[in-house]
From Swiss-Prot:
The gene is ppk. The lineage of its organism: Bacteria, Bacillati, Bacillota, Bacilli, Bacillales. This is Polyphosphate kinase. Belongs to the polyphosphate kinase 1 (PPK1) family. An intermediate of this reaction is the autophosphorylated ppk in which a phosphate is covalently linked to a histidine residue through a N-P bond. The active site is at H439.
Length: 719
């Protein structure tokens, strides 16, 4: 793909950010939240945990994929920053090491800060003497029975260690020679143990407890040295869809295989490890020096989520103030089905409650007038009320069709479980589509009303997950629009059968049309700007990687169209480059909630065109996923969306802008402090409070209403 605009070559690598390095920049912005002292202390620790969890997935998928390319001898540069796989791996190591060093520096600072609240993370030898019997009892009865030391010699080869498992390497003097052993720490027991003395709480990590009592595992030998290490394995494996007679069985095979993928990262607690032992482990695991990370602290800081939960009761004032999602402004106290017959209903989670969406499916399942329910599910919670409602609907005799996407990465096992359960309840379950992931969020309820069928459609930007709906920002719409209803019916028929691509009235569906519509809308904005001088595009998404769309945005910028991009994560476009992207602005917001909604706005000379979507402007969303882009035609809802995006562009507390070199900086100006997420929480709470007051205020009846009331009373007495 080569694109010139006049004498400008738009393909030059200096105009682009590499996808993987841009993702690392995003994860650093997550780490910045752990460095932000305006966040409560326990929340700062939580952000360190999120940073680690993100990084695990990055290595299991993205780094693993690059390593596979290098092993196969593939050295073609990617199509934007034009880095080969090997060059990307080198730069990932350099950037990630720098960021991880900052992570551990901040971790150690925060652990030190906990001391002022009478909480200390210590080694066993630092525990007060009178608590040592309790420690010994915990080890003897709660830990030791779960451990299996694995000696390594000619008769005992190096064990196949599980992905993300925590292990202790042990050097043992056996008189004749020095041998090695591995102690794998079971994942199903607690990572830390708490000991109390007065107001003081001592926390000891399980690896430190095992190390303290290590001689009990190797009785009769001398332990010379120990250190902890952790392996991350390749989870970017191929699901063989073509030859699979039953995709459920194939997914289960794939899940077993993924646990034992090749090692892609070795993390070592560098405080005790020796060079000789590290070289030995590297050879056993067949990893390269570039894959080894030494850290100054405990491994796997995802455990901080559990630690924060453990400390939350005692130190709840060191967490965010609890926020309860409010009744949606667009819904108020109305019944969702009654109101949607009159107008579209808009939802903005988590500021507004996800409960009405749960109720939407539950009420449909219970209503005897409901004929059919159809829904796509990508990620749902472990105890999903929506799943329960779909089961109930099928058991109540309604026709229920559910597409459960079995290939939703790291949710495959959960989704296999739900697929089986739904089938047992009598639902017609679709496992997805060959070589595509169904990422769209749509639910269709068909009811018999007044002797005719009426369709109610929910379309959203986020998953039908009642848990993540409290921490992800997402949007949704419920409508009874006849054209969208027809589209929804055709869409589900496409998913459930062998029908070719349907024709749609209003919905725009990938992998067929979303990219083409984006390109056409941008072209139209360029044309409009040349004619009217007011071209403007605002896009909000998680990530931007698709080169066709980036090139078209460059064209728009060169034509003078103002382009504002609100992109939380990966952004392969560099804004502000003179003559190329000088009219493009990129802002990223990382805060309390994960920004997840996708909004696409085209000014269209004042006749605004606004879409919501399940899709980011990423190549995978354009060609490898089934996605839905849907129009927002209600003027009041459209205004809310525009106001929302302008609010986010004004965020000078959690907003960062990207400069022409691809670097991100906090937005600093002389305006009043504005945290867009905090603003929206307050706005929702104010509405909720006003609604509550309106409901409790005595209602004053009109004269006619009073007459009607007295008439009813007289009739009662006549009876």
């Amino acid at each position: 793909m080569h694109r010139n605009l006049g004498d400008k070559d738009l393909n030059l690598p200096q105009y682009y950010n590499n996808r993987e390095l841009s993702w690392l920049d995003f994860n650093y912005r997550v780490l910045q939240e752990a460095q932000d002292k305006n966040n409560p202390l326990l929340e700062q620790l939580n952000f360190i945990s999120i940073f680690s969890s993100n990084l695990d997935e990055f290595f299991m998928v993205r780094v693993a994929g690059l390593q596979d390319q290098v092993k196969m001898g593939y050295d073609k540069p990617e199509n934007k920053a034009q880095l080969t796989p090997k060059q990307q791996l080198v730069q990932i190591k350099l950037k990630n090491k720098e960021i991880v060093d900052l992570q551990y520096k901040r971790y150690n600072e925060l652990i030190d800060d906990l001391k002022q609240y009478q909480v200390e993370i210590i080694k066993p030898e630092q525990l007060p003497d009178d608590l040592l019997p309790q420690l010994e009892s915990e080890f003897k009865y709660g830990i030791l029975p779960t451990l299996t030391p694995l000696g390594i010699d000619a008769y005992h080869p190096f064990p196949k260690l599980n992905n993300k498992s925590l292990n202790i390497f042990v050097d043992i003097d056996t008189e004749d020679d020095i041998n090695s052993a591995i102690v794998q720490i079971p994942s199903l027991i607690s990572r830390f143990y708490s000991f109390n003395k007065g107001d003081k709480q001592y926390i000891i990590l399980i690896e430190d407890i095992i190390t303290y009592f290590i001689n009990d595992l190797f009785s009769g030998y001398t332990v010379l040295n120990t250190f902890t290490f952790r392996i991350t394995r390749n989870a970017d494996l191929t699901i063989h869809e073509d030859g699979a007679e039953d995709l459920l069985i194939e997914i289960e095979r794939f899940l077993k295989e993924r646990k034992r993928g090749t090692a892609v990262r070795l993390e070592v607690d560098g405080r005790q490890a020796t060079h000789e032992d590290i070289v030995w482990i590297i050879n056993q695991l067949d990893v390269h020096d570039n894959d080894v990370y030494f850290v100054d602290g405990p491994l796997d800081l995802t455990m901080l989520t559990d630690l924060v939960d453990h400390l939350s009761n005692k130190l709840k004032y060191l967490k965010y103030n609890k926020y309860v999602p409010q009744i949606p402004q667009s819904l108020g106290n109305h019944n969702i089905f009654d109101l949607s017959l009159k107008r579209d209903i808009f939802f903005h989670h988590p500021y507004e409650s996800f409960e009405p969406i749960v109720d939407f499916i539950r009420e449909a399942a219970e209503d005897p007038n409901t004929i059919a329910i159809k829904q796509t599910l990508y990620r749902v919670s472990k105890d999903s009320p929506i799943i329960n409602s779909l089961k109930n609907a099928a058991e109540n005799g309604k026709q229920v069709t559910v597409l459960v996407e079995l290939k939703a990465r790291f949710d495959e096992e959960n989704n296999v479980h739900w697929a089986r359960m739904l089938e047992e309840a009598g639902c017609h379950v679709i496992y997805g589509m060959t070589h595509l992931k169904t990422h769209s969020k749509i639910a269709l309820v068909v009811k018999r009303m007044n002797n005719k069928l009426t369709s109610f459609i929910h379309l959203g930007t986020g998953n039908y997950n009642d848990k993540t709906a409290n921490i992800y920002t997402d949007m949704g719409l419920i409508t009874t629009n006849a054209e969208i209803a027809e589209d929804a019916i055709n869409f589900f028929n496409y998913l459930s059968g062998y029908s070719v691509k349907p024709e749609y009235n209003k919905l725009i569906v990938a992998p067929f049309d979303i990219r083409d519509v984006f390109l056409a809308r941008i072209d139209n904005e360029i044309k409009s700007h040349r004619e009217n001088g007011n071209g403007k595009i605002i896009m909000k998404m998680n990530s931007l990687t698709d080169k066709d769309i980036i090139l078209k945005l460059f064209e728009a910028s060169c034509a003078g169209v103002k382009v504002q991009l609100i992109i939380r994560g990966i952004c392969c476009l560099k804004p502000g480059v003179p003559g190329i992207s000088e009219n493009i602005e990129v802002v990223s917001i990382v805060g309390r909630f994960l920004e997840h909604s996708r909004i696409y706005h085209f000014h269209n000379n004042g006749d605004d065109i606004i879409y919501l979507s399940s899709a980011d402007a990423m190549t995978r969303n354009m060609i490898k996923r089934v996605e839905i882009l849907f129009p927002v035609e209600d003027k009041n809802i459209a205004k809310r969306l525009l106001d929302y995006m302008n609010l986010q562009l004004s965020d000078n507390q959690k907003g960062r802008y990207q400069d022409e070199l691809g670097q991100y900086h906090y937005i600093e100006n002389n305006l009043s402090p504005l945290n867009s997420q905090a603003f929206l929480m307050k706005e929702a709470m104010d509405y909720g409070q006003q609604l509550k007051e309106d409901n409790t205020r005595p209602q004053v009846m009109s004269v006619n209403e009073r007459k009607g009331w007295f008439t009813k009373i007289r009739k009662q007495f006549r009876k």
